[in-house]
A protein has these predicted regions:
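Acidic, His- and aromatic-enriched active-site or binding-groove loops in soluble protein domains
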Residues: 93-107
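Substrate-binding/catalytic cleft of secreted carbohydrate-active enzymes
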Residues: 1-94, 113-116
Length: 119
């Protein structure tokens, strides 16, 4: 089931745990909007808010679940599409919507924790 609005709870076990679709924070970047309505799983009002929410999602929701066996992630979604503006890149693929350094830092923190736990 999709889990956009509920706490993430990975239970330790003998199987691989994957978060196969998460994120979906909408923000229509000015000058790069798709031609139709805008949709996402929660809406940010600015690039700064989008970046902050991405960091918080990674730090407070995903990172703590690594110790329980979370092993794979798929962020929704890579780029905006006609009816959804919840991508990391704009509809025209011309701009990364959140701050690149902040995204890199959040992702590197996940990678470092995963490496620490799986050594």
């Amino acid at each position: 089931r999709h889990n956009y609005f509920y706490p993430l709870r990975v239970r330790p076990g003998k199987r691989v745990a994957a978060l196969s679709e998460y994120g979906g924070i909408a923000w229509p970047m000015p000058g790069h909007e798709p031609p139709r309505r805008t949709y996402g799983y929660g809406t940010a009002k600015s690039r700064a808010e989008l970046t902050e929410r991405y960091q918080k999602l990674q730090r407070d929701t995903v990172l703590p679940q690594l110790k329980n066996g979370l092993s794979a992630l798929v962020y929704t979604q890579v780029s905006d599409v006609e009816d959804e503006v919840n991508g990391l890149f704009t509809y025209d693929r011309a701009a990364l919507k959140p701050d690149p350094a902040a995204v890199r830092a959040a992702n590197e923190a996940l990678e470092a924790e995963f490496e620490r736990l799986t050594r």
